[in-house]
Amino acid sequence: MKSESFRKQALSLVLFFAAVAAVFALTHLRSDPAKKQAEFVVQQLLSCSSAVEQAVDAAVPAGSEPGLSAADTDGLYAFLQAQLGDAVTANCLDKVMANRLPTRITALAGQSGDKLVPADLTLKKRAGAENCYDFSATLLTATDSTAAAQVSGTITMVKEDGRWKAAAITLNL
């Protein structure tokens, strides 16, 4: 009798651990590290903090308007590189600078008269495109959470040096 009771307990224990392992496996499959990293990058780019404004202001000559003058982008590039770290490829950072994404977002903040904070950020995997996500968010003013703009775009992730990094970013304002 004892051996049969032991077998039932052992079988129950094995089934329990198999169920726990299955739950962990399913949870791991559901988690998408590329998407999490993409969300971080988009959040950082859309956040118009005072540090971003200062870096943009330092890059643009006094009296010029965003997008119309040559800017000293070295300081802004160094700032973004420090802010995003290993989250973007060097080529992607070059494209972000060439497309003036930080200055476009800062210009929106200037128009609203307040710092902007992204809210309701959603990322959705693009059908048929591996590691490409469509995103959308509302940019709210920091003071009273008034909607200042609706933004959308895409972000494509690649695995480089064992880490997920943004390879391309588009932004529609």
Describe the predicted segments one by one:
Residues 103-145:
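Surface-exposed, charged secondary-structure patches
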Residues 38-42, 139, 166:
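Generic alpha-helical hydrophobic packing signal
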Residues 73-88, 117-126, 140, 172:
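Short, Lys/Arg-enriched charge-dense amphipathic segments
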Residues 33-110:
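Core segments of small alpha/beta cavity-forming domains
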Residues 148-173:
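Short beta-strand edge/turn micro-motifs at domain boundaries
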Residues 20, 56-60, 130-131:
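Short amphipathic alpha-helical segments, especially helix-boundary/capping motifs
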Residues 1-45:
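Gram-positive cell-envelope targeting signals
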